[in-house]
A protein has these predicted regions:
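N-terminal, active-site-proximal structural segment of metallo-dependent hydrolase catalytic domains
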Residues: 2-6, 20-75, 89, 93-94, ...
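Structured beta-strand-rich core segments of catalytic domains in phosphoester-bond hydrolases
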Residues: 59-145
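His/acidic metal-ligating clusters that form di-metal
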Residues: 160-193
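Metal-dependent phosphoester-hydrolase catalytic domains
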Residues: 110-111, 177-187, 195-306
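Active-site environment of divalent metal-dependent phosphoester hydrolases
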Residues: 37-39, 66-71, 92, 139-142, ...
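Structural recognition of the beta-strand scaffold that forms the well-ordered cores
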Residues: 28-31, 59-63, 98-99, 130-133, ...
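Sec-dependent N-terminal signal peptides
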Residues: 6-16
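A solvent-exposed, charged loop/short amphipathic helix patch at secondary-structure junctions
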Residues: 142-162
Length: 306
């Protein structure tokens, strides 16, 4: 009898150890543009926090924070990093980007362009990872670029005509620098790129894009740096898993424009999902109905430390 109990206890300890190790090596990242700090609906910041609570990410890469960060962080019990100069008040309503974490923060990663790129190092069970929150301008934009009567070459030139391409060129040196250091310190880059993906405009999808295969510059640049689009890696078929994060009621304007990219020998994605609902309408997560405060969908990717 004693021997049987000893075997059972040993087995239970093995299971517990396995569970703890799984927790130590796995983490979940969320990227979300919350739209004007969530303030465009009644109790919006609270609804933002409730949605995050149901998804339960370990790290959040947030866009359009605009003063709501401290409330959301306090509500959820996360560490909070505002992507702005150190002396900036955490509730500054002009600051766009932020990062939340259940894990301790390390070194700041400041850029000359904090409105559209910045980051911080986070230590996850002994592994330092560089996290970046990002926003790029929405122009140029067309709801249905496949109907613009442009060739692939003309579309690529059109894509470079306004603010988004200029922003990308400004932050590209930072991205190159950190991408080149990922053998020792991996990086995760996420947010609202306001850009279509070259991985969604392929030969497999040309029938829904007026027979066009378009290597969109914004995402192709990241691909060239070796960054992996986590959602498309885990959901390789754009037809069955479009991953829409931008959709407008009453018109054809459904696109995937929010992303989580990563690079590094010591991390890999294991699962990626998207969540979406129309602004000011209900979203149901884990059986709970919450009024959706944003016009952007959510990307959530699970990672594992190698």
């Amino acid at each position: 009898m004693f021997h049987a109990r000893l075997i059972f206890c040993s087995f239970a300890l093995i299971l517990l150890s396995t569970s703890v190790n799984a927790q130590k090596t796995s983490f979940k990242v969320m990227a979300w543009n919350i739209l004007h700090g969530g303030n465009d609906i009644e109790n919006g910041p609270e609804n933002v926090a409730k949605i995050i609570k149901e998804i339960n990410p370990d790290v959040i890469l947030m866009v359009e924070t605009y003063g709501s960060g401290p409330f959301i962080a306090d509500y959820l019990g996360y560490n909070f990093h505002l992507i702005a100069s150190e002396e900036t008040p955490l509730n500054d309503t002009s600051v766009n980007l932020s990062i939340y974490s259940k894990y301790p923060f390390g070194k700041r990663i400041d850029t000359k362009f904090p409105f559209y790129l910045g980051g911080i190092e986070i230590s996850i069970n002994g592994q330092t990872i560089r996290f970046f929150s990002n926003w790029f301008h929405y122009l140029p934009w067309d709801n249905e670029p496949e109907k613009m009567r442009k060739s692939v070459e003309e579309l690529l030139e059109w894509e470079k005509t306004e603010s988004r391409h200029k922003m990308i060129q400004k932050v590209l040196p930072y991205l190159k620098k950190f991408a080149n250091e990922t053998d020792s310190i991996p990086m995760i880059f996420g947010g609202d790129m306001n850009s279509l993906s070259h991985l969604d405009w392929t030969k497999k999808t040309k029938k829904i894009h007026n027979n066009l295969v378009v290597p969109w510059n914004a995402t192709e640049i990241l691909d060239d740096l070796g960054l992996i689009d986590s959602y498309r890696k885990e959901n390789p078929n754009p037809i069955t898993h479009p991953g829409v994060t931008w959709d407008k009621k009453g018109r054809k304007d459904s696109h995937r424009i929010d992303y989580i990219f990563y690079k590094g020998k010591s991390i890999k994605s294991t699962k990626s999902n998207s969540y979406n609902a129309f602004f000011n309408e209900p979203i149901i997560i884990n059986g709970k109905e919450i009024i959706y405060p944003s016009d952007h969908g959510i990307v959530v990717t699970s990672f594992k430390l190698r």
